[in-house]
Structure formats: structure tokens, C-alpha cells
């Protein structure tokens, strides 16, 4: 297996390259009867799309979805759902000067070592263009989770370089190109990114994603833990170098009396665990965050070697994101939704006859 598929009961297989004729995916395991139309994909695909602000890549793709199979008269049939998006704004000539060079910090060298051949145009299969189809598949998962269980998956940018939110408002997240939760800071982010872009450098970021309404009981110990699969899903996103569940690495500095989430009949008093204990959901919000490294495609020269082993300086032209984290929020949401839908179906398959178990503790209460 070449690991282009994700999930067990609800599976997603993606295909295509950044500068190929098209990208696509096959979604299998979706229950029948879910209403699904091409226009339902537009919102999330446009949230992920480049060319929407001066702070992202200038590449402009229409990202119009084509449903090839698995939907009849507007409803899923239970058979594989084929989705396709045609690439229309490739500029492969921008990569001719680095076709034989390995960009430091990029997958050029590792793909070459693994396969002995690589597609240098836009990064080929290693390009974040592939995540477009993850977002498309996530649209299906988000809708099913919301309709079936009332689960709402949403995310936001929680750090850009050294800048962190000075406040939080979910309503602000969708009103700016950064998915930033504090509207008053958006001008600061604009100024920072303008200066960064002019310098030719890039910067890292952090994205938080939250799923509210997840019932207690989802997750499979020992090797199918909800948090383990969520961490793997987020780590599979391009440029991600770290993932936290709940308080994550901050837990190392906490005492047990600080970290444990006390329980009352009215609900949990905190959520340091991120809504998961023993690999199984608690009924609280499932929370995770991921850190993305700075973009490695830079206009600033950097030392490397070429395919002949000669020392060269590489300069990347073309259209690239100075901060990949700016467009990563919809991708993180999609991956969490895919994990949750797969886990929901697996839980239903094994434990659907268990029924309501008492006591059922509500989610976190305000204290």
C-alpha cells in the first residue's frame, strides 16, 4: 500500500498532482440518503483557496467540484463517491530552474530518494494542492456529523509568527482572511505579512480546531484511540510539525490536581484532556492544535545540491504562500471531521446496541 487512503469504515483516497490535469478523491463508506449537491462544496473550498488575499499564493483555481459517482437525484447511494477538480492555473515554467535542485526544507530530496523520480512542477504530489480534496471530503463528513449528531467542527488561526490572539470571538474568525479570532488585531497581521512578503521570507503558524457536540464513547482502545488517529490525521497535513490534544505539551508543567478535569453531575469543570480520555471521547468538546513550519519555497538564496551532487544556491520563483498556516484552518477542520465520522461509524458498528449508559455527564460547565 502506498498510503494514499485514509480511514477504516469511512475512507478517502486522493489522487493527482499540483500541476497535473486534475486532482480528485474517492470517498467510500458514506451512508446512503445524505443530500449532496456540487454547490455545497463551494464554501469550504473557497475558504481554503489561494488568491483570495495578497497574503497567500497568487495562484487562482476555480476549484469547481464534479461529482462523478455515488450520488443519484441529489442523494448519496452508499456506493463510492467520486469527486474531481480540474487544475486550470498551473505555471509549470516557474519550476524549470529548480527541476534538478533540492529545495532545503522541502520534500524534493525525500521524494527523489524514495522513488528515484519526482514531479518538480509545483511540488507534484507533495504540494498542498492535494489538501483541496481533503477539504472536499470533509464537506461530506461535516454535513453528516452535523445532521446525525449535531457535531460542529470549526477552527481558527491561533498564532502567526510571534503574534497570538489578544481576545477571542468565533464571529470574527470568518470575517478576515486569516481566520483570526480577534478583529482588532487584523491590521497588525496585515502589516506583518506585508513586510514579510517584501523581505522574501516566510513564517510558521499554529491552528486550533474544535469539535463541539461529540457524544461520549467514540474511539477504539488500544490502537484505534481517537486522539491517536486525530494526531496522525493532522500530522499528515503538509508542513505540520507538531500536534497537541487538549493542553498538550503544557501538561508537562502541570500537577495532577491542575490537569485532571473534575466531574460533577452538572458536567466537567474543565477540559484539559481535550475531550478524550483513554482514547475515547468524554462528551466534551474535542480540541486539538497543530503547528506548521515556515514555507520552504523562498526567493532568498539557500545552499543545496542538485541531482548531480553539485553544490548550488537555490532561489524559488513562482507563486507560494509566505505562511501556509493562513489557509490551513479548513484543512484541519476537514481532517478532524473525517476522523470523527470514521470513528462514529465504527462505534455504531460495534456498540450500537449498548444504548444509553448512566450516568451521562454533560459537557463542560461554566465555573
UniProtKB/Swiss-Prot annotation:
Region (Disordered): 41-60
InterPro entries per the UniProt record, alphabetical: Chorismate_synth, Chorismate_synth_AroC_sf, Chorismate_synthase_CS
UniProt pathway annotation: Metabolic intermediate biosynthesis; chorismate biosynthesis; chorismate from D-erythrose 4-phosphate and phosphoenolpyruvate: step 7/7
Cofactor note: Reduced FMN (FMNH(2)).
EC number: 4.2.3.5
Names of required cofactors: FMNH2
Biological processes, Gene Ontology terms: amino acid biosynthetic process; aromatic amino acid family biosynthetic process; chorismate biosynthetic process
Keywords: Amino-acid biosynthesis, Aromatic amino acid biosynthesis, FAD, Flavoprotein, FMN, Lyase, NADP
UniProt binding sites for NADP(+): 48, 54
GO molecular function: chorismate synthase activity; FMN binding
Annotated catalysed reactions: 5-O-(1-carboxyvinyl)-3-phosphoshikimate = chorismate + phosphate
Enzyme class, broadest EC rank: lyase
Gene Ontology cellular component annotations, sorted alphabetically: cytosol
Residue sites binding FMN per the record: 125-127, 238-239, 278, 293-297, 319
Alphabetized Pfam families for the sequence: Chorismate_synt (PF01264)
Highest taxon, organism lineage: Bacteria
TM spans (from-to): none
Subunit-structure text: Homotetramer.
Record's function text: This reaction introduces a second double bond into the aromatic ring system.
UniProt family annotation: Belongs to the chorismate synthase family.
Protein name from the UniProt record: Chorismate synthase
Organism phylogeny: Bacteria, Pseudomonadati, Pseudomonadota, Gammaproteobacteria, Lysobacterales
Amino acid at each position: 500500500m502506498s498510503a494514499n487512503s485514509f480511514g477504516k469504515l469511512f475512507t478517502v483516497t486522493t489522487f493527482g498532482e499540483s500541476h497535473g490535469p486534475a486532482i480528485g478523491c474517492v470517498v467510500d463508506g458514506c451512508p446512503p440518503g445524505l443530500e449532496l449537491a456540487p454547490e455545497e462544496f463551494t464554501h469550504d473550498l473557497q475558504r481554503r483557496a489561494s488568491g483570495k488575499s495578497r497574503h497567500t499564493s497568487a495562484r487562482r483555481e476555480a476549484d469547481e467540484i464534479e461529482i462523478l459517482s455515488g450520488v443519484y437525484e441529489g442523494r448519496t447511494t452508499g456506493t463510492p463517491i467520486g469527486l474531481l477538480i480540474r487544475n486550470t492555473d498551473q505555471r509549470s515554467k516557474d519550476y524549470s530552474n529548480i527541476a534538478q535542485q533540492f529545495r532545503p526544507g522541502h520534500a524534493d530530496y525525500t521524494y527523489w530518494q524514495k522513488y528515484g523520480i519526482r514531479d518538480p512542477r509545483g511540488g507534484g504530489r507533495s504540494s498542498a494542492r492535494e489538501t483541496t480534496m481533503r477539504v472536499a471530503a470533509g464537506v461530506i463528513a461535516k454535513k453528516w456529523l452535523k445532521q446525525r449528531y449535531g457535531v460542529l467542527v470549526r477552527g481558527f488561526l491561533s498564532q502567526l509568527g510571534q503574534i497570538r490572539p489578544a481576545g477571542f470571538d468565533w464571529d470574527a474568525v470568518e470575517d478576515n482572511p486569516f481566520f483570526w479570532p480577534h478583529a482588532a488585531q487584523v491590521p497588525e497581521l496585515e502589516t506583518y505579512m506585508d513586510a514579510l512578503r517584501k523581505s522574501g521570507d516566510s513564517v510558521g503558524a499554529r491552528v486550533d480546531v474544535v469539535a463541539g457536540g461529540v457524544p461520549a464513547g467514540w474511539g477504539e482502545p488500544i490502537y484505534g484511540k481517537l486522539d491517536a488517529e486525530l494526531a496522525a490525521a493532522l500530522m499528515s497535513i503538509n508542513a505540520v510539525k507538531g500536534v497537541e490534544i487538549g493542553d498538550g505539551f503544557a501538561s508537562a508543567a502541570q500537577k495532577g490536581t491542575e490537569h485532571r478535569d473534575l466531574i460533577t453531575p452538572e458536567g466537567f469543570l474543565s477540559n484539559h484532556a481535550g475531550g478524550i480520555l483513554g482514547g475515547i471521547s468524554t462528551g466534551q468538546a474535542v480540541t486539538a492544535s497543530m503547528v506548521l513550519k515556515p514555507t520552504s519555497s523562498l526567493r532568498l538564496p539557500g545552499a543545496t545540491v542538485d541531482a548531480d551532487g553539485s553544490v548550488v544556491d537555490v532561489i524559488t520563483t513562482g507563486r507560494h504562500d509566505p505562511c501556509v498556516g493562513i489557509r490551513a484552518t479548513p484543512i484541519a477542520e476537514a481532517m478532524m471531521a473525517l476522523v470523527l465520522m470514521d470513528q462514529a461509524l465504527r462505534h455504531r458498528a460495534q456498540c450500537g446496541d449498548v444504548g444509553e449508559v448512566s450516568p451521562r455527564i454533560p459537557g463542560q460547565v461554566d465555573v
